[in-house]
């Protein structure tokens, strides 16, 4: 089931005369992939903190939203610790984008508690947002 995360097959070493030219392009590909990927993770992770002032208009207090925000930090720390060994045994070309897509999808569902639970169900909305933000933090740790 998880074969798509398996590390790629070992490639033969390049001849010595081709190493410099091939590695120049690889350096840029790796740098841009990591830079864009990490920037995407950062934007997804910090998205909720920018929405906190707007959520106050819907009756949420900053103290309640800080609990939701702290779930992200807890999940991120746990995920970095636990998913590190998983990522070492995985294909980084699949693992990083998978984490980014899952984090973005989880963040897109953050509107559901605000839209579908009214002020009378604020505690349920906080719980759903906390679970979703935990998932965002977990996937960001991938």
What are these language model-derived features?
Residues 29-56, 60-62:
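Extracytoplasmic
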Residues 120-142:
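Hydrophobic core of transmembrane alpha-helices in multi-pass small-molecule transporters
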Residues 61-69, 125:
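Juxtamembrane helix-start elements in MFS-like secondary transporters
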Residues 46, 73-81:
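Residue-level signature of mid-helix packing/kink "hotspots" within the transmembrane helices
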Residues 79-91:
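Helix-to-loop junctions at the C-terminal end of transmembrane segments
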Residues 101-121:
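C-terminal ends and interior cores of transmembrane alpha-helices
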Residues 34-38, 42, 73, 129-137:
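Helical-face signature of the major facilitator-like transporter fold
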